[in-house]
């Protein structure tokens, strides 16, 4: 058996999907740049057209003028070559944590894909070097704070422009290095950015878009995992599976809601009406799970559309139409679609946290868990009084849920006039994307805790005299989980197991519904 080499992602050849960015961010696929001569000539034509305008002393924003409100300031031709370095230099003021390696790769992929449209006036050499950064895993150290999301992600992307020029720092082979040293080691000459090239690199939405791709992928897996956890909790709490009847959902046919109900039926092995239970209706966190999770499921389609259109767009300013010999000044750097998508996603995901938190609250409370021990403790009767099982885990889950819900405040409504009122309406899309990532982190923590607790609940229920065999999908999941998370009989610190579960979620370890 041979290891199959994955097909490379060829920039400049086709539109990218979120899955392409995820694969690039995880170093799962190689990259190449379109080698077709006609394509390369088209890229070159944009840079040549700009040079011809300079020869004619044409006025081009950010090339022969200052930036932002300084666009009324003419830059003499003898200073035009120096302007790109000034742009990335004065924007070197980012703060906050550095983007991690996965996020940085996603940013590089998003910026390269945008510039490969050939309407930004950059040389093929710039595209080649960006692709080489991805290929060799040379990762600019990018502070995550400092963007208002219009004009694009200027400050964070200045770190891309600077490192391509051999300045500032990169992460390379696990070490924090000077970009100039890494260039020397790889035998590269640092780029000297030509007129418009620093602006083309920086004046776009690559940071928010790269983060949005990662957030979408995490939310998609979380949706499936939350559905599986719900099915396990239906078993642990002796819930009523008729709440997920296919005929019931035909009466209110939201597609995502119907999909989640179908997944639950499959997990619970329901293919026919079941015998009536003593409890006609479960609490909402079980009964209405398809209605909560279905909103996220239905939203994934339009979220994908917003993100992928942005990903595959030319989103800087000005746009260089070399064919028509025109320079088009506009506002494609405005990240409004990503801002709205991420503000919406964090609301959708926080509702998943709230749902799972409520399910865990039922599991640990002997007044509502239908015969399970208090706090899901597996201790024998003579030691029950000193064992507390999942009590603290449930408290922690409440804290994580509260923080997730707090972070759902939309970022896009906090537009601030800035840059001498030139940027008087801005998207805050990068803040929205960062918020969405944080809400996902917190919700994954809730999911990890609830998953381990649900598995404990299923185990405890299986010990009852009237226990039924687990449906196949849940039996397989229970067996997989038991290998990592043995039953809690005597109290033990669960931090390590929670962290392991989070890593399993990050790795998409369990094959779930749509995979």
How would you describe each model-predicted region?
Residues 2-57, 87-143, 234:
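Glycine-rich, flexible loop motifs
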Residues 38-41, 45, 62, 78, ...:
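Generic alpha-helix structural propensity
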Residues 61-83, 90-115, 143-165, 180, ...:
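FAD-binding core of FAD-dependent oxidoreductases
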Residues 119, 148-150, 385:
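Conserved, non-catalytic sequence blocks in retroelement Pol enzymes and Pol-derived host proteins
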Residues 128-135, 155-158, 162, 224:
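A broadly conserved amphipathic alpha-helix scaffold signal in soluble, globular proteins
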């Amino acid at each position: 058996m041979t290891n199959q080499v994955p097909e490379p992602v060829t920039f400049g050849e086709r539109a990218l999907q979120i899955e392409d960015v995820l694969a690039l961010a995880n170093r799962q696929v190689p990259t190449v740049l379109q080698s077709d001569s006609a394509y390369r000539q088209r890229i070159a034509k944009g840079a040549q057209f700009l040079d011809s305008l300079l020869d004619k002393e044409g006025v081009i924003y950010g090339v022969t003028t200052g930036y932002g409100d300084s666009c009324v300031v003419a830059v003499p031709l003898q200073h035009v070559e120096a302007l790109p370095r000034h742009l990335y230099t004065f924007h070197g003021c980012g703060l906050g944590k550095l983007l991690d390696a996965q996020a940085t790769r996603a940013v590089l992929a998003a910026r390269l894909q945008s510039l490969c449209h050939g309407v930004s006036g950059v040389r093929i050499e710039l595209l080649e070097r960006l692709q080489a950064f991805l290929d060799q895993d040379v990762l600019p150290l990018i502070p995550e704070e400092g963007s208002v999301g219009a004009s694009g992600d200027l400050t964070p992307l200045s770190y891309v422009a600077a490192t391509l020029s051999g300045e500032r720092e990169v992460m390379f082979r696990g070490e924090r290095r000077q970009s100039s040293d890494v260039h020397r080691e790889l035998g590269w000459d640092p780029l000297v950015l030509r007129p418009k090239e620093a602006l083309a690199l920086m004046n776009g939405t690559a940071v928010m878009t790269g983060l949005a791709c990662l957030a979408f992928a995490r939310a998609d897996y979380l949706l499936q995992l939350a559905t599986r956890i719900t099915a396990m909790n239906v078993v642990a709490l002796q819930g009523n599976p008729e709440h997920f009847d296919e005929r019931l959902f035909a009466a209110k046919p939201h597609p995502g809601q119907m999909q989640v109900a179908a997944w639950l039926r499959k997990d619970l092995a329901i293919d026919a009406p079941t015998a009536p239970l003593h409890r006609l209706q479960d609490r909402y966190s079980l009964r209405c799970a398809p209605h909560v999770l279905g909103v996220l499921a239905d939203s994934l389609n339009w979220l994908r559309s917003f993100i992928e259109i942005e990903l595959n767009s030319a989103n800087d300013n000005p746009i260089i139409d070399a064919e028509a010999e025109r320079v088009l000044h506009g506002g494609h750097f405005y990240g409004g679609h990503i801002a709205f998508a991420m503000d919406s996603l964090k609301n959708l995901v926080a509702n998943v946290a709230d749902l799972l938190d409520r399910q865990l609250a039922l599991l640990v409370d002997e007044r509502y868990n239908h015969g399970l021990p208090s706090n899901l403790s597996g201790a024998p009767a003579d030691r029950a009084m000193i064992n507390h099982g999942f009590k603290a885990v449930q408290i922690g889950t409440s804290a994580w849920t509260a923080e997730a819900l707090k972070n759902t405040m939309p970022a896009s409504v906090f537009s601030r006039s800035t840059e001498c009122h030139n940027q008087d309406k801005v998207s805050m899309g990068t803040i929205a994307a960062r918020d969405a990532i944080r809400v996902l982190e917190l919700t994954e923590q809730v999911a990890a805790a609830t998953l381990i607790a649900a598995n404990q609940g299923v185990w405890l229920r299986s010990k009852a005299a009237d226990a039924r065999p687990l449906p196949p999908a849940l039996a397989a999941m229970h067996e997989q989980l038991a290998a990592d998370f043995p039953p809690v009989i005597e109290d033990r610190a669960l931090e390590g197991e929670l962290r392991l579960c989070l890593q399993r979620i990050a790795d998409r370890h369990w094959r779930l519904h749509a995979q």
